[in-house]
Amino acid sequence: MATEQRPFHLVVFGASGFTGQFVTEEVAREQVDPERSSRLPWAVAGRSREKLQRVLEKAALKLGRPTLSSEVGIIICDIANPASLDEMAKQATVVLNCVGPYRFYGEPVIKACIENGASCIDISGEPQFLELMQLKYHEKAADKGVYIIGSSGFDSIPADLGVIYTRNKMNGTLTAVESFLTIHSGPEGLSIHDGTWKSAIYGFGDQSNLRKLRNVSNLKPVPLIGPKLKRRWPISYCRELKGYSIPFMGSDVSVVRRTQRYLYENLEESPVQYAAYVTVGGITSVIKLMFAGLFFLFFVRFGIGRQLLIKFPWFFSFGYFSKQGPTQKQIDAASFTLTFFGQGYSQGTGTDKNKPNIKICTQVKGPEAGYVATPIAMVQAAMTLLSDASHLPKAGGVFTPGAAFSKTKLIDRLNKHGIEFSVISSSEV
């Protein structure tokens, strides 16, 4: 409930940023959802009132909502001003943090939210940030009874919830899953805003600290159920999808593994092994990506190399990333398919000595990943946090999407909003 002390259910922080403007549009759509009994009280937050006002005016024009600007609160807030972050958090039930790269700008928002009793959702795809925040703030968030949920965009809700969906649909014990991401584009091709590119550069350039963080965490290994899932070669051919694939370098594997650990340790659910890949089509695409990958991995090791990668994203990514981001036509024509191939054991079959005897294939399909599916996932995660509290983990804390939402109706919400989960096949072998 909105109150005088906390007047907004949702606050979109960074609403005037490239991704934030799309999240703002999605919240505006949710505000007038016919299934809602009342209007959603919400606000946008950022450094410039003029920029925030322009974002609201643009959304109003696009959605045919001329009165939108007068219906939405505006909060002036600067990541460099902790007092302004406190004031924002005091007014929100849930903060949707769209300000990245999160390794530089994410922690002050989380700290302000915890100290002032607001929950926070972000769309980070940065494993080091996500794992560090869980290590530093899980107990503090639990003490305050608030939920800090990272990676709630395309990274990594489709993968994390997709594995849970696959497990729920298997008539037996799921032990291992491989996922294959396929990105579909229209005649004008693909383009991704360079904010994502920067996050990848900083993440790959700091792999040693991620390893140190995991050593400090000193977590016990999760038990291995069934045969160990074999890693594919850096370039492999997927017969089922009739195309080549490479390992997916996003946060999905890190997030899914953390979820599986939580479900095993807290809910006594059998852990699932997981590997993630992205399909790249034919041999020409493979060669192109090999060169791009070699360039990236060479330059990202050095400070001056990282500066060059950041300054010339279009050149070093072979045209996939740009400072301008995608056009509306590119966004409208794009979509994704995430295909899961799972294996496990039918009910009553022992997992110790027997080979897996059941297979399942599921899919998650949706619109353009970065600026349509991500806002949908983020906003529906927030709405689930607001409306399905009885099925969340009992105490607050820092969670992955799967850990927070495995018992909620988030998958149903996503299905209704264009991110569709389905079973393709299931069979005993």
UniProtKB/Swiss-Prot annotation:
Its EC number is 1.-.-.-. The modification N-acetylalanine is found at A2. Gene3D superfamilies: NAD(P)-binding Rossmann-like Domain (3.40.50.720). It holds the Pfam family Sacchrp_dh_NADP. GO terms for molecular function: oxidoreductase activity. It is an enzyme of class 1 (oxidoreductase). GO terms for biological process: glycolipid biosynthetic process. Keywords: Acetylation, Oxidoreductase, Phosphoprotein. The modification Phosphoserine is found at S217. GO terms for cellular component: extracellular region; lipid droplet; membrane; midbody; mitochondrion; nucleus; platelet alpha granule lumen. Belongs to the saccharopine dehydrogenase family. This is Saccharopine dehydrogenase-like oxidoreductase. The gene is SCCPDH.
